[in-house]
Amino acid sequence: MSKSENLYSAARELIPGGVNSPVRAFTGVGGTPLFIEKADGAYLYDVDGKAYIDYVGSWGPMVLGHNHPAIRNAVIEAAERGLSFGAPTEMEVKMAQLVTELVPTMDMVRMVNSGTEATMSAIRLARGFTGRDKIIKFEGCYHGHADCLLVKAGSGALTLGQPNSPGVPADFAKHTLTCTYNDLASVRAAFEQYPQEIACIIVEPVAGNMNCVPPLPEFLPGLRALCDEFGALLIIDEVMTGFRVALAGAQDYYGVEPDLTCLGKIIGGGMPVGAFGGRRDVMDALAPTGPVYQAGTLSGNPIAMAAGFACLNEVAQPGVHETLDELTTRLAEGLREAAEEAGIPLVVNHVGGMFGIFFTDAESVTCYQDVMACDVERFKRFFHMMLDEGVYLAPSAFEAGFMSVAHSMEDINNTIDAARRVFAKL
């Protein structure tokens, strides 16, 4: 047995499923998950000594690549002053100043410890600010594991949500309306059925949890207009897209102003950080200045703030996003060409430093139904064959891939060459 297999066997006796987040178990592709010993730049190194070109990037945070010296040094320096104080620090102020400068729609920001905390807190704030209970989310969009968000669509866009995880009371789920991503008609229908009851829409501006599905041109502006028409708040969940699709996020890339924004992943530089913020009048409703309660023992942790501050300063440097886009575009084009040469039907979506691979005969993939029609079994084979070639993709047909500026054009070309060999055998 390999070291990964031995560790996985031991882990399953001690940790549910052997992992601390389900997708890591390779449930979506089968086989034994890799146990990682170290990472540097664009590469992961497993406990058995094999190196992989990494397109998971810790599920998004590693936009600069692994073990970036500026972040590593910031963490070491901060740790020498203490690990946690439970009191305000100067770095929290500097971090808030930087975030609000980089994302102009955020007048104020509250730091938390994860993307889930950010989205659940933003929704609570929207409900408290509007005095309404219902929310709209989209089928196939994931916003963390808060109870009100673990809801799938029923039969039709207006069906009251049913929980898709045991442990979520139906009384919670009934306030979550699930609409179809990229379908404004379904959203208008929900508002017309509940015109005075919907507090907010929460949306991934690029749906990254049904792989990578960009918005149609009219979709995000249409959501903004519907929120304005019916008095609801628009929450853009930029946990995945923030500082990756563009410096000011997908909201800047697509030209849409939300009322609230949720951030995570890149904002922590690899440390556990989330944030939410937006309009000053809305944020003023948050405790201690307002009645909507939110708190956290480790929120604004000095080590995490130092890592995030260092990361964002690097991400804000000229040329970073141009490089991400160039590398991702080359990868997407190369994969399409290699698949076409082999007669493999393939769609590759990409925006900024995100991409998605879909085995499908369709010309495009724009919604959850399109994603579910893709050939998942072929993706599983593709994943394992690419892994054997030394390329680490997300171990699920429903997760986006992530580029970093640490990837070289040689890495991209080697990945395309590996895919060409795999497609020939697929």
Curated annotation (Swiss-Prot):
One of its GO terms (cellular component) is cytoplasm. It catalyses: (S)-4-amino-5-oxopentanoate = 5-aminolevulinate. InterPro entries: 4pyrrol_synth_GluAld_NH2Trfase (IPR004639), Aminotrans_3 (IPR005814), Aminotrans_3_PPA_site (IPR049704), PyrdxlP-dep_Trfase (IPR015424), PyrdxlP-dep_Trfase_major (IPR015421), PyrdxlP-dep_Trfase_small (IPR015422). Keywords: Cytoplasm, Isomerase, Porphyrin biosynthesis, Pyridoxal phosphate. GO terms for biological process: protoporphyrinogen IX biosynthetic process. The keyword Repeat does not apply. GO terms for molecular function: glutamate-1-semialdehyde 2,1-aminomutase activity; pyridoxal phosphate binding; transaminase activity. Its EC number is 5.4.3.8. Pathway: Porphyrin-containing compound metabolism; protoporphyrin-IX biosynthesis; 5-aminolevulinate from L-glutamyl-tRNA(Glu): step 2/2. Coiled coil: none annotated. The modification N6-(pyridoxal phosphate)lysine is found at K265. Its cofactor is pyridoxal 5'-phosphate. Signal peptide: none annotated. Homodimer. Belongs to the class-III pyridoxal-phosphate-dependent aminotransferase family. HemL subfamily. PANTHER family: GLUTAMATE-1-SEMIALDEHYDE 2,1-AMINOMUTASE, GLUTAMATE-1-SEMIALDEHYDE 2,1-AMINOMUTASE 1, CHLOROPLASTIC-RELATED. This is Glutamate-1-semialdehyde 2,1-aminomutase.
